[in-house]
């Protein structure tokens, strides 16, 4: 399928500009550019409420649907940004949309970023944040039995590894995982890194430079650097994966679907056509975002089917 019209225009502009390299940006410019890209998001959903809180020294953004009462299901969200950028500012529109469309509380974690903080800082923050939310569930107004871990790109990676860490401790388990074009393979072994790695704004260079700044010499096949290769998925809760047709990460996301099913995990996967990595944040220009947002919101409160669509 060809690129969606709005995304095709963005891609054409990127190519016309000479395919700017993320490696040539300093980290401040890279982060500022990500924040600037929020102008491409959907309109701000103002019918929800949002507040930032600090628990046990960690900062969270809590987005609540209108008239929230009782113990609500929770989407615990890890933002993307290749481990080096992103945060509440870049993801606020999506957090608000998810809270509105799902009727759940959406809680975002601000984890430490590279290059200031290298592996395993983000992983440790992701796990610790999940445990804090579980511990304070009553105070937060959420049902601790209905916590879904979700995230996009690097955040999808952190959601998966956090669930694996929680499984190993057997303290508690999330109800579901929602992984939006997750970064899973620091070795860049899958074909879509080549076929989609140059022209589609979030390039091979963008993704791998993020991995490099975060991993800082860690073995690229380390089970928490490249979780796609793990053999201990059995026992995870149901998982849903979103992939994008023109994404360097497309193939590894779909390979994860097969590996999870092979290891006995209930898993669904949907490839969105005509879109690129990061499309979930392009609601102002992409039609696919609307259906993806509705689908993700629905899956938080609905059973998984175990089929790939």
Could you say what each language-model-derived stretch is?
Residues 89-107:
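Short amphipathic alpha-helix adjacent to the substrate-entry channel of hydrolases
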Residues 1-65, 305-309:
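A glycine/proline-hinged amphipathic helix-loop "lid/cap" segment
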Residues 285-309:
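Catalytic active-site module of serine/aspartate enzymes centered on a nucleophile-bearing elbow/loop
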Residues 164-219:
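Hydrolase active-site cap/lid region
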Residues 134-149:
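Gly/Ser-rich "nucleophile elbow"/oxyanion-hole loop immediately N-terminal to the catalytic nucleophile
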Residues 151, 155, 159:
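Gly/Ala-rich beta-loop-alpha elbow adjacent to hydrolase catalytic centers
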Residues 241-243:
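Short beta-strand/loop motif that positions the catalytic acidic residue
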Residues 71-81:
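Short beta-strand element of the alpha/beta-hydrolase
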């Amino acid at each position: 399928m060809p690129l969606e019209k709005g995304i095709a225009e963005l891609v054409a502009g990127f190519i016309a500009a000479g395919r700017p390299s993320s490696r040539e940006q300093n980290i401040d410019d890279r982060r500022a550019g990500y924040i600037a890209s929020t102008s491409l998001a959907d309109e701000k959903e103002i019918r929800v409420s949002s507040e930032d809180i600090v628990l046990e020294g960690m900062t969270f953004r809590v987005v609540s649907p209108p008239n929230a009462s009782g113990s609500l299901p929770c989407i615990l969200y890890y933002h993307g940004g290749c481990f080096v950028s992103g945060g509440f500012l870049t993801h606020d529109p999506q957090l608000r949309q998810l809270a509105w469309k799902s009727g759940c509380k959406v809680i975002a974690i601000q984890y430490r970023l590279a290059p200031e903080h290298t592996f395993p800082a983000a992983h440790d923050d992701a796990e610790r944040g999940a445990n804090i939310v579980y511990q304070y569930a009553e105070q937060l107004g959420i049902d601790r039995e209905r916590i879904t871990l979700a995230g996009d790109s690097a955040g999808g990676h952190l959601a998966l590894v956090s669930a694996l860490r929680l499984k190993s401790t057997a303290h508690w388990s999330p109800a579901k995982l929602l992984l939006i074009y997750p970064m899973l393979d620091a070795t860049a072994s899958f074909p879509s890194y080549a076929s989609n790695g140059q022209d589609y704004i979030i390039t091979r260079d963008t993704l791998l430079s993020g991995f490099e700044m975060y991993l800082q010499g860690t073995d690229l096949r380390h089970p928490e650097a490249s979780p796609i290769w793990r053999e201990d998925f059995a026992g995870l809760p149901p998982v849903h994966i979103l992939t994008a047709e023109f994404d360097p990460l497309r193939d590894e996301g779909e390979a994860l679907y097969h590996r999870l099913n092979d290891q006995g995990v209930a898993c669904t996967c949907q490839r969105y056509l005509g879109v690129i990595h990061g499309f979930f944040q392009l609601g102002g220009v992409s039609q696919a975002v609307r259906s993806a947002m509705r689908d993700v919101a629905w899956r938080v409160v609905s059973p998984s089917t175990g089929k790939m669509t």
